[in-house]
């Protein structure tokens, strides 16, 4: 609810909590078990997110939803060892889509690679299927997750003939 991504985190957290409140009130929980949505304020700080996980994992977690790629990267080995699901909706480690390797990480409905592909497909659609010679720029922050789409965009550049500007 605070930090650099508060503008997106606040409404998400509100709706997430409201959904589980609705399940409790309407359905008596999930399978008869009432749900709780404990929150930890991380300010998008990875260390605080890991501290939150460590302090709450023993409370019978159904799933963790950190809303932070940095926190997600640090939690992947922990949730795998602890057998707790991690939902990283639209962010997180893209390669975690391989469920044979990452058994407790679920990054649906999309990830950074999907997003890059969708953007290029949109450009193809709006340019008659041909973007050869066009310039596509990716503005990103200098972090592991900020760089996640680069390889996909490079591969698609080779396939479709556009110039990638980073």
Which functions belong to the PLM regions below?
Residues 1-17, 41-46, 68, 139-148:
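Extracytoplasmic "Venus flytrap"
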Residues 1-8, 24, 36, 165:
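Short intrinsically disordered, low-complexity coil segments enriched in acidic
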Residues 14-37, 129-131, 158-162:
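Signal peptide-proximal N-terminal region
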Residues 20, 53-57, 123, 161:
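Generic helix-packing signal
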Residues 26, 56-59, 126:
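Generic structural signal for alpha-helix termini and adjacent loop/cap motifs
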Residues 33-58, 116-118, 166:
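Structural motif
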Residues 47, 61-165:
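Extracytoplasmic ligand/sensor domains, especially the bilobed periplasmic-binding protein
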């Amino acid at each position: 609810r605070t930090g650099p991504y508060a503008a997106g985190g606040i409404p998400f957290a509100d709706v997430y909590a409201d959904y589980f409140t609705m399940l409790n009130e309407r359905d008596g929980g999930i399978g008869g078990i009432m749900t709780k949505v404990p929150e930890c304020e991380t300010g998008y700080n990875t260390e605080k997110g890991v501290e939150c996980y460590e302090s709450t994992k023993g409370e019978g977690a159904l799933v963790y939803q950190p809303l932070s790629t940095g926190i997600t990267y640090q939690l992947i080995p922990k949730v795998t060892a602890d057998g707790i699901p991690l939902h990283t909706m639209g962010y997180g480690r893209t390669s975690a889509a391989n469920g044979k390797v990452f058994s407790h990480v679920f990054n649906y409905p999309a990830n950074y690679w999907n997003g890059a592909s969708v953007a290029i497909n949109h450009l193809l659609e709006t340019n008659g299927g041909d973007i050869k010679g066009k310039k596509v720029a990716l503005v990103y922050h200098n972090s592991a997750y900020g760089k996640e789409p680069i390889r996909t965009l490079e591969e698609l550049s080779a396939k479709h003939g556009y110039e990638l500007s980073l």
